[in-house]
Amino acid sequence: MKSEWDFGTLIGLLAGVVCIFVAMVWPEGDTPIIIPTEGSGFRWEQLSWFFQPQSVFIVVGGVLCATLVNYPLKAVLGLGKVFKNVILSEKFDFTGMIDNIVVLAEKSRKDGLLSLEAGLSEIDSVFMRNGVELAINERDSSRLRTFLSMDLNNISTRHIGAQEIILYMAAYAPAFGMLGTVLGLIIMMNKFQMSGETSSIDFNVAEQFASLLSGMGTALITTFYGVFFANMVFLPIAGKLKRRSENELMLKNIVLEGIISIHGREHPILIREKLMTFVALSERKMSENKEV
């Protein structure tokens, strides 16, 4: 086996070091000040406390760099497609798929399994189309099940891989948030120490402690962003990917069992009854009411 350079790891390590270095020398801007407002209205001025580009840079940049080190570059670049799938809604019509399988079963039982070959191009599902084509060419039902199960396992493995990347990103985010906070506290304490070395005339204790507390609040913002991205972005996305994967795999399991049943020349009514066991009871009752 030939070894090759993993450029994703190199890019991640170098970019991570640069990210931390930039955070260390980030130019200091004016510290936002809370201006209390009268009455019970919202204090919109307080929002300025939470807009810290440096904090977002450390958390997001650090998470991306660590992910590049942990995973191949190709897998990280594929995250765009993963996030797109999360945003787009996809409906899994289990009963509709069962109806399509029953139609194929009726045609196969009437005209033979080879008659399904003419309608392969009309099947939208790639997994189902490949499965029907395989059923036409494969005589051994056990081998057919093995091939379809292998395909299904490969799909499941890819789904788990995408979920794993997002879960690792969720784990990295609070860690980089804490790293940014520690970095901010170190810079803040050093500034306080340098201020204390000035003459007593220039050194105002009240002002320095006010600056210290203000700087501590700014430093803690990075932890806030780390926790926010982990629990509001990455973990919910990973959970949604898991739910969607479970539904997709169940739909493909229905297809798998349906193709095996068609290959075994089972009666369409028995095929429907068997496949409907995959469907939730409430959805099953809705389907029965439509038929009535």
What is each stretch, according to the model?
Residues 2-8, 19-164, 247-292:
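Large intracellular
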Residues 4, 11-14, 18-40, 154-244:
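Helix-termination/interfacial motifs at the ends of transmembrane alpha-helices
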